[in-house]
Amino acid sequence: MTNIRKTHPLIKIINHSFIDLPAPSNISAWWNFGSLLGICLIIQILTGLFLAMHYTSDTMTAFSSVTHICRDVNYGWLIRYMHANGASMFFICLFLHVGRGLYYGSYTYFETWNIGVILLFAVMATAFMGYVLPWGQMSFWGATVITNLLSAIPYIGTTLVEWIWGGFSVDKATLTRFFAFHFILPFIITALVMVHLLFLHETGSNNPSGLISNSDKIPFHPYYTIKDILGILLLILALMTLVLFSPDLLGDPDNYTPANPLNTPPHIKPEWYFLFAYAILRSIPNKLGGVLALVLSILILMLFPILHMSKQRSMMFRPLSQCMFWILVADLFTLTWIGGQPVEYPFIIIGQLASILYFTIIILILPAISLFENKLLKW
């Protein structure tokens, strides 16, 4: 009798994706983040579902419903903080996953890479709308500031903003629709993840050397399943340490004050994972220019396959490109720090220089260094 695992229409798909999948024998721990992102998504959907059972998306009761979850619901505090800090873990894994793709040249898989960038946008949109839901001061003002950026779009801007708000300011209609979108988007993300994997399995995984590994494959199970389980345990350990010891470490104290349209917080800033983009937005004095730079700071990832000038795929054997890559990482840390600082000297100029450096490295320096390395190797 043939194995049901290999014949059953549904189980067969799972088998080809997670069990009998031929995988390169040398993929490192940097390849763990795909599975970790899957676990993060599952954690977020499950905790979010239980939060939605007790949350009310009305301006009068939203804040107190979150308080009710934390105080009166069995383990409600745990679910709420797992969801809030789960988002932070999600973004840590996302940034490392994208960074791995950039370092090892995984972006040469066009479809997989582009769907990954779309996924990044979708996750950022979901996180932004989720941050609005507790209806604290930073929720309200964050929503006001970020949605207002759309008014920079010529001709249709103002109409578009009022259409998104459902009125003339961020109010009940805005909160209700943000809750609806925040609920549906993770399921759209799950569908996109499946397409992401579909395209990945068309080509097979990349590996640290960037060389074709068809002659040296091993089965995904048991080798990489056990490796993924180790990663998952470490992820859960990190998440639960954060949740149980310092759940508010990454949050903003202003969000423990109920939303008040008449009182603006002294420093409006998003969650830490948006600060690098926020710093780029603020570094341009022009509103439309800032919005364009903000969008391009993520959209530029789609240009990497076009800007790849090296004859080698990975940066593993390219020390000059490696050096530039780590300068780019340091620059992103600088932008993240600047995004959380007030708009005053010297932070303004540091932010502007870091923003210029970010785009210059990606568009000019990395391709130029790649061409230089080709010359050094007489290619």
From Swiss-Prot:
Heme b b562 binds at residues 83, 182. The keyword Nucleotide-binding does not apply. GO terms for cellular component: mitochondrial inner membrane; respiratory chain complex III. Its cofactor is heme b. GO terms for biological process: mitochondrial electron transport, ubiquinol to cytochrome c. Keywords: Electron transport, Heme, Iron, Membrane, Metal-binding, Mitochondrion, Mitochondrion inner membrane, Respiratory chain, Transmembrane, Transmembrane helix, Transport, Ubiquinone. GO terms for molecular function: metal ion binding; ubiquinol-cytochrome-c reductase activity. It is found in: Mitochondrion inner membrane. PROSITE patterns: CYTB_CTER, CYTB_NTER. Heme b b566 binds at residues 97, 196. Its main location: mitochondrion. A ubiquinone binds at residue 201. Binds 2 heme b groups non-covalently. It comes from the Eukaryota. The chain crosses the membrane at residues 33-53, 77-98, 113-133, 178-198, 226-246, 288-308, 320-340, 347-367. InterPro entries: Cyt_b/b6_C, Cyt_b/b6_C_sf, Cyt_b/b6_N, Cytb/b6-like_sf, Cytochrome_b, Cytochrome_b_C_euk/bac, Cytochrome_b_N_euk/bac, Di-haem_cyt_TM. CDD domains: cytochrome_b_C (cd00290), Cytochrome_b_N (cd00284). It is a multi-pass membrane protein. Component of the ubiquinol-cytochrome c reductase complex (complex III or cytochrome b-c1 complex) that is part of the mitochondrial respiratory chain. The b-c1 complex mediates electron transfer from ubiquinol to cytochrome c. Contributes to the generation of a proton gradient across the mitochondrial membrane that is then used for ATP synthesis. Heme 1 (or BL or b562) is low-potential and absorbs at about 562 nm, and heme 2 (or BH or b566) is high-potential and absorbs at about 566 nm. This is Cytochrome b.
